[in-house]
């Protein structure tokens, strides 16, 4: 799923800079495939039918020159949805999302100082997602399609990766007295988590 997700922004950017409607269509079908990937991996027949039907339905707006408008939606919708996910977990009586993930990855009792820290990391991700949403909407309204695409389909993902790596490095430095796995091992464990939201 992670690697499947990386393909979409690259296809979307390629579609924008080449003005190729076939690549626009492929990017939108790829996005639909990501949305249906869980059901398709569970071999649900309806998911494959939905992918085929959705692919056919996406062909007409793309060929009518409207595909670019659909490509503007994910760079704003994804950070908005993630912001809501992180922010709702910060409500009173809820366990912050990053805290829940850390507890699932941690062996043994979860230390109090890490409970406080992971709450702050959840707040950090709220701020990052809000900034990416504002950036995506502002660029969609005021920038050229090529600049919008470069920023939202390339630079925004670099920012996400940089924040992730910086937070990981800071946590290893600040909380070095706790056991930490290497970055690649940490990423593998993170991708295996089944989180109920």
What are these regions (language model features)?
Residues 10-23, 35-43, 64-65:
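Short, hydrophobic transmembrane alpha-helix segments
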Residues 1-2, 21-25:
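Phosphate/adenylate-binding glycine loop and adjacent helical scaffold
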Residues 110-197:
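C-terminal membrane-adjacent module
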Residues 1-10:
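Alpha-helical transmembrane segments
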Residues 29-39, 55-60, 78-87, 158-163:
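Alpha-helical transmembrane segments and their membrane-interface exit regions
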Residues 4-5, 26-30, 47, 51, ...:
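Hydrophobic alpha-helical transmembrane segments of polytopic
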Residues 67-125:
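Membrane-proximal helix-loop-helix units in multi-pass membrane proteins
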Residues 38-79, 130, 134-141:
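Long, highly hydrophobic alpha-helical transmembrane signal-anchor segments
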């Amino acid at each position: 799923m992670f690697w499947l997700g990386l393909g979409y922004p690259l296809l979307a950017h390629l579609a924008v800079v080449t003005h190729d409607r076939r690549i626009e269509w492929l990017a939108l079908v790829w996005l639909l495939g990501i949305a249906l990937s869980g059901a398709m991996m569970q071999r649900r027949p309806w998911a494959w039918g939905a992918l085929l039907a959705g692919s056919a339905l996406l062909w007409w707006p793309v060929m009518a020159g409207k595909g670019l408008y659909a490509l503007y939606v994910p760079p704003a919708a994804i950070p908005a949805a993630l912001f809501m996910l992180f922010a709702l977990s910060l409500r009173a009586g809820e366990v912050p999302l990053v805290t829940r993930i850390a507890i699932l990855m941690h062996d043994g009792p979860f230390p109090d100082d890490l409970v406080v820290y992971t709450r702050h990391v959840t707040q950090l991700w709220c701020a990052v997602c809000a900034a990416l949403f504002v950036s995506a909407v502002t660029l969609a309204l005021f920038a050229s399609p090529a600049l919008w695409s470069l920023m939202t389909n390339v630079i925004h993902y670099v920012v996400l990766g940089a924040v992730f790596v910086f937070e990981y490095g800071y946590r290893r430095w600040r909380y070095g007295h706790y056991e930490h796995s290497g970055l690649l091992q940490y990423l593998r464990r993170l991708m295996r988590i089944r989180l109920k939201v």
